[in-house]
Amino acid sequence: MKAKEINELTTDEMINKEKEYKDELFNLRFQLATGQLENTARLKAVRKNIARIKTALRQQELNK
C-alpha cells in the first residue's frame, strides 16, 4: 500500500488496516518459525505498511 493511498483513508479505516496488517504479521511470523513461509519479503512489506499507517495517523493527529 502506498503512502498516497493511506493518506486518502479515514482515521477509522487506517486503524482497521493497521490491525489487519498486525494480524497478518503475527501469522507470517508463525509461518516463518515453522518453516512454511515461502515469501520472506512479505514480512518486510507488512512491517513497512504498518509504519506508513502509523506515520499517517500521527500526521493527522498533529494537523488537528
From Swiss-Prot:
SUPFAM superfamilies: Ribosomal protein L29 (L29p) (SSF46561). GO terms for cellular component: cytosolic large ribosomal subunit. It comes from the Bacteria. One of its GO terms (molecular function) is structural constituent of ribosome. Keywords: Ribonucleoprotein, Ribosomal protein. Transmembrane segments: none annotated. It holds the Pfam family Ribosomal_L29. GO terms for biological process: translation. InterPro entries: Ribosomal_protein_uL29 (IPR050063), Ribosomal_uL29 (IPR001854), Ribosomal_uL29_CS (IPR018254), Ribosomal_uL29_sf (IPR036049). NCBIfam families: L29. Belongs to the universal ribosomal protein uL29 family. This is Large ribosomal subunit protein uL29. It comes from Pediococcus pentosaceus (strain ATCC 25745 / CCUG 21536 / LMG 10740 / 183-1w). The gene is rpmC.
